C-alpha cells in the first residue's frame, strides 16, 4: 500500500493529523513533553484562558466515577497576558499548531480576548468555550441559548482573523439549533461535546463529593451521547467538527470520524495514560493500513453513506 495521508483541515487550520487534545486535560502542553513528542500531535489545545487570572473553585473539585470523572476546576489559569508572556514562547518552538481555548463572563470579554490573541504570534486558532455563565444575564450559560451563543461567536469573529472553533455544550434540548446559530454567526468549525452536567454524593458524609456540588462529567460514560450529537450536527451544518467526549482509544477516535468529525480531541484518557494521544494516532494509522484507506479524510462522515438526502 502507498503512503497514507493523515492531513486534515479544521476550519482553515491545517493539521498534520487529526489527533489533538481536549482543553483542560493537557495543561499548556509542555507538561506532557516528558511522555510524548509534542511535534507529532495535529494540534495542541491549551487549557481555558480568561482575561484575568483565576484561582478556580474550592476543593475537592475532581472525582472519579465508574465510567469517567467529574470536574469543577473553575477555569483556573494565569490570565491571557501571563499566558502570552510565559507559556506561549516555548510552545512556538514546537512544530505543532496551538489552539487557545477562551472563556469570558460577558460578550465583551470574549471580544477583548479574541483581539488580544489575534495579535499573539504562535496562536493558530481560537476555541470558544460557551459553557460559561453570562454574568449580565443572571448566570445563564451562553451555550444554552442560541442568541447568546451567536452573540459570543460574533464578538470573537469580529475581533480575529484566526480560525474560530466554537465548543458546544451538550446540556441543551437541540444541539443542531445551537450549531446552526453559531455557524450563522461566523464559526469556522465546531467542537463537541463539552462535559455533561453531573454530580455525586458521598453516602458516609451525606454531602456532595464536589465542593461546587455540580461538575462536568467526562470519559467513556458520555461517548454514546457525543457520537449521537456529532452525527446529528454533521447532517445539520457544513463546517468541520472537532469531536470529543469519551475517546479512550483509536477505535473510539475512528468511530467519531465516521460519525462526522474531521479531527478528534483526547481528554480524560490523558489522566490515565499520558501516551494516549500517541497510542490513538498509531491506532488510526494501523486501521487505515489494514482497511486499505489511503487518505484519512475518507473516514469523515462515512457512517452516513447509507443514507440519502
Curated annotation (Swiss-Prot):
FMN binds at residues 23, 47-48, 101, 129, 167, 193, 219, 245-246, 267-268. Binds 1 FMN per subunit. Substrate binds at residues 47, 71-75, 129, 194-195. It catalyses: (S)-dihydroorotate + NAD(+) = orotate + NADH + H(+). Its cofactor is FMN. Pfam families: DHO_dh. PROSITE patterns: DHODEHASE_1, DHODEHASE_2. The active site is at residue 132. GO terms for biological process: 'de novo' pyrimidine nucleobase biosynthetic process; 'de novo' UMP biosynthetic process. InterPro entries: Aldolase_TIM, DHO_dehydrogenase, DHOD_1B, Dihydroorotate_DH_1, Dihydroorotate_DH_1_2, Dihydroorotate_DH_cat, Dihydroorotate_DH_CS, Dihydroorotate_DH_I. It is found in: Cytoplasm. Disulfide bonds: none annotated. Keywords: Cytoplasm, Flavoprotein, FMN, NAD, Oxidoreductase, Pyrimidine biosynthesis. Its main location: cytoplasm. The keyword Flavoprotein applies. Heterotetramer of 2 PyrK and 2 PyrD type B subunits. Catalyzes the conversion of dihydroorotate to orotate with NAD(+) as electron acceptor. This is Dihydroorotate dehydrogenase B (NAD(+)), catalytic subunit. The gene is pyrD.
Amino acid at each position: 500500500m502507498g503512503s497514507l495521508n493523515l492531513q486534515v483541515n479544521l476550519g482553515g487550520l491545517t493539521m498534520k493529523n487529526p489527533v489533538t487534545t481536549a482543553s483542560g486535560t493537557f495543561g499548556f502542553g509542555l507538561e506532557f513533553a516528558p511522555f510524548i513528542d509534542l511535534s507529532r500531535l495535529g494540534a495542541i489545545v491549551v487549557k481555558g484562558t480568561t482575561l484575568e487570572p483565576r484561582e478556580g473553585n474550592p476543593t475537592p473539585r475532581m472525582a472519579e466515577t465508574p465510567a469517567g470523572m467529574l470536574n469543577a476546576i473553575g477555569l483556573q489559569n494565569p490570565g491571557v497576558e501571563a499566558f502570552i508572556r510565559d507559556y506561549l514562547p516555548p510552545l512556538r518552538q514546537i512544530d505543532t499548531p496551538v489552539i487557545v481555548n477562551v472563556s469570558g463572563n460577558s460578550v465583551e470579554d470574549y471580544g477583548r480576548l479574541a483581539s488580544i490573541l489575534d495579535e499573539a504570534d504562535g496562536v493558530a486558532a481560537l476555541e470558544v468555550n460557551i459553557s460559561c455563565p453570562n454574568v449580565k444575564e443572571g448566570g445563564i450559560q451562553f451555550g444554552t441559548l442560541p442568541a447568546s451563543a451567536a452573540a459570543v461567536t460574533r464578538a470573537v469573529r469580529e475581533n480575529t482573523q484566526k480560525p474560530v472553533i466554537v465548543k458546544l455544550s451538550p446540556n441543551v434540548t437541540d444541539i443542531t439549533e445551537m450549531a446552526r446559530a453559531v455557524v450563522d454567526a461566523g464559526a469556522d468549525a465546531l467542537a463537541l461535546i463539552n462535559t455533561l452536567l453531573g454530580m455525586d454524593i458521598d453516602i458516609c458524609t451525606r454531602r456532595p463529593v464536589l465542593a461546587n456540588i455540580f461538575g462536568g462529567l467526562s470519559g467513556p460514560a458520555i461517548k454514546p451521547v457525543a457520537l449521537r450529537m456529532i452525527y446529528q450536527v454533521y447532517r445539520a451544518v457544513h463546517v468541520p467538527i472537532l469531536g470529543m467526549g469519551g475517546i479512550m482509544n483509536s477505535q473510539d477516535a475512528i468511530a467519531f470520524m465516521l460519525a462526522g468529525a474531521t479531527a478528534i480531541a483526547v481528554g480524560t484518557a490523558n489522566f490515565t495514560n499520558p501516551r494516549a494521544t500517541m497510542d490513538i494516532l498509531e491506532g488510526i494509522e494501523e486501521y487505515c493500513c489494514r482497511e486499505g484507506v489511503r487518505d484519512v479524510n475518507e473516514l469523515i462522515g462515512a457512517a452516513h453513506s447509507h443514507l440519502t438526502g
